[in-house]
Curated annotation (Swiss-Prot):
Pfam family, one: Ldh_1_N
Function: Catalyzes the reversible oxidation of malate to oxaloacetate.
SUPFAM superfamilies in the record: LDH C-terminal domain-like (SSF56327), NAD(P)-binding Rossmann-fold domains (SSF51735)
Catalytic activity: (S)-malate + NAD(+) = oxaloacetate + NADH + H(+)
Name under which the protein is recorded: Malate dehydrogenase
Amino acid sequence: MKQPVRVAVTGAAGNISYAMLFRIASGEMLGKDQPVILQLLEITPALDALKGVVMELEDCAFPLLAGVVQTDDATVAFKDADYALLVGARPRGPGMERKDLLEANAAIFSAQGKALNEVASRDVKVLVVGNPANTNALIAQRNAPDLDPRNFTAMTRLDHNRGMAQLAEETNSTVNDVKKMIIWGNHSSTQYPDLTECTVNGKPALEQVDRDWYENSYIPSVQKRGAAIIEARGASSAASAANAAIAHMRTWALGTDENDWVSMGVYSQGEYGIAKGLIYSFPCTCSNGDWKIVEGLDTSSDFSQEKMKATEQELSEERDAVEHLLP
């Protein structure tokens, strides 16, 4: 049996974590031969609820669960962490402007970035799930100057999966038949679900769907899927977000399938003309615990450029709104 790895999870008593922790403890994220120690962070008022979740984890008697830490102190939760899933974030309350939300979360993710910088493993893999995920990841990254910026990622795998599922439905195929889906940009309604490189059953996706459907139905539907779920369920997507977080980490740790890629919000070095330092979703391949942006794709069409720039613009504006709070 391998040595246990430490997996930190914030917002650990929340809905997304409740749909995620049991799957991590069962080996679904890092493999059936990898023991894990869960290091769970919550705000002080939620520690009792967290205790209940931990009791349930114990009652599952997972062979791979080598230990559980429960705390309201980030430096305890992130101590020697190999993986960190930052799920907890301030939700948008009634009458809150986006700017208020950005600032409230800036305080949370600054503190978490500092704690990661101080105590986490130097190779820690950080995934930000809590929204606004891309900018929260940027805030954490900027507060962790001793860690490689490449260690910080934001989740667009949920959008990626939504895009695959809706394309599979339209083409009467299964998600297994869909390859090379791309989500560019922000995990928000400005994201660009791009089918230019995508294939279904080995053939170009755009030859199998109507262009009008793609531009005017598919793209807005993927962009607004989160809102549609809130409308229908009366609560935001939790199980599907948990599933995407597990898939993002599993791919990062264990690698992408051959001849395919995934979408990840990662640190831009100027690829595809995107401003350096933004956390922007690109198509990525993973191997040996590292990610790499897929380069050399043709994004020169006016349609693609307009969409990629619009979501970049939103990310730049979000960064500018919190710049005064960043080191």
